[in-house]
């Protein structure tokens, strides 16, 4: 990641017709998945279609507030707006799960995982399980620039309004083919064009948005003991943005007695689209099946230890 300094001309919001991925199926639970910061529902597409086709689950992948809008609009997003956006989507999914009389499983990638943990703590009676995919509590991956450590200081200065990280290879992906497609798209992007994102997300990350993410993370850490439902954690050993420390921290601090930690060997941060996306989808499907069995009374809570073998199961 490289740092770019610029004043991005404000532009009005645009009408977003693509509100996310919404798949119908008659299965035994409702699944809601949330994308990451500056990402899009597209990064969850493979997992969503797998769960619909293999698990026969209805899947909801909403677009978080201001994602898909011009960069100047996205940069003004507060952490409260992000959480309220997730909560609004959650309420819709909860209503559907109640209407179907089936459990609700929620999950997310990176920021999406943080939001889902917060929802699970606030609505313990409504969340049957949480899947955390590359959860982000610490930006400590091997590709995070040293200047990222200055964000806590920049949060108290006007500098945060003019600083942007430009996304660089590997873009959170070990898959070289997909990485090449993203590079071709991002190379066409200029920070001063201030255009809306493509289905591949934004080429620039507003530092101000990272500052807001810090506030979400601090709140998420505080509520971890209140998360009592089953939790699945999946992370890559070589995650370029967030090290395995993130999943281990959650594993060690959540209140749930049913928790499982899966480590992947051939992926980077965006595990939902990378080389082991099929493995991730299979683990999430199995997790949903376990949640359904627990509700039916045929499977009691089991505490799972963190083992590398899980990744190859």
Task: For every predicted segment, state its role.
Residues 260-313:
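Catalytic active-site module of serine/aspartate enzymes centered on a nucleophile-bearing elbow/loop
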Residues 227, 233-235, 239:
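Short beta-strand/loop motif that positions the catalytic acidic residue
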Residues 111, 118, 122-205:
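Alpha/beta-hydrolase-fold enzymes
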Residues 70-105:
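Catalytic nucleophile-loop/oxyanion-hole region of alpha/beta-hydrolase
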Residues 240-246:
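Conserved alpha/beta-hydrolase "acid-adjacent" motif
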Residues 58-60, 247-248, 252-270:
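Catalytic histidine neighborhood in serine/cysteine hydrolases
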Residues 16-19, 205-223:
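Active-site nucleophile elbow and catalytic-triad environment of alpha/beta-hydrolase enzymes
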Residues 12-70:
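Short, surface-exposed "cap/lid" segments of acyl-processing enzymes
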């Amino acid at each position: 990641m490289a740092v770019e300094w610029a004043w991005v001309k404000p532009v009005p919001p645009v009408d977003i017709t693509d509100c996310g991925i919404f798949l119908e199926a008659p299965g035994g639970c409702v699944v809601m998945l949330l994308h990451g910061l500056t990402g899009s529902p597209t990064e969850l597409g493979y997992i969503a279609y797998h769960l619909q086709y293999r698990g026969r689950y209805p899947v909801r992948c909403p677009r978080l507030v201001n994602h898909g809008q011009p960069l100047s609009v996205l940069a003004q997003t507060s952490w409260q707006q992000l959480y309220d956006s997730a909560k609004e989507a959650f309420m819709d999914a909860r209503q559907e799960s109640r209407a179907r009389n089936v459990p609700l499983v929620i999950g997310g990638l990176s920021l999406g995982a943080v939001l889902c943990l917060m929802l699970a703590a606030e609505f313990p009676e409504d969340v049957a399980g949480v899947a955390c995919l590359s959860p982000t509590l610490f930006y400590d991956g091997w590709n995070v620039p040293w200047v990222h450590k200055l964000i806590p200081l920049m949060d108290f200065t006007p500098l945060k309004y003019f600083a942007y990280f430009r996304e660089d290879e590997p873009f959170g992906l070990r898959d070289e083919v997909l990485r090449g497609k993203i590079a071709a798209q991002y190379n066409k992007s200029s920070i001063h064009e201030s255009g809306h994102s493509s289905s591949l997300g934004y080429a620039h990350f507003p530092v101000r948005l990272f500052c807001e993410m810090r506030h979400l993370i601090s709140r998420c850490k505080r509520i971890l003991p209140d998360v009592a439902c089953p939790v699945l954690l999946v992370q890559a050993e070589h995650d370029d943005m967030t090290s395995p420390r993130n999943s281990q921290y959650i594993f060690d601090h959540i209140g749930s007695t049913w928790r499982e930690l899966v480590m992947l060997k051939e992926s980077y941060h965006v595990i939902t689209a990378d080389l082991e996306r099929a493995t991730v989808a299979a683990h999430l499907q199995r997790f949903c099946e376990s949640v359904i069995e627990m509700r039916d009374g045929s499977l009691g809570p089991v505490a799972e230890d963190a083992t590398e073998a899980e990744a190859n199961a």
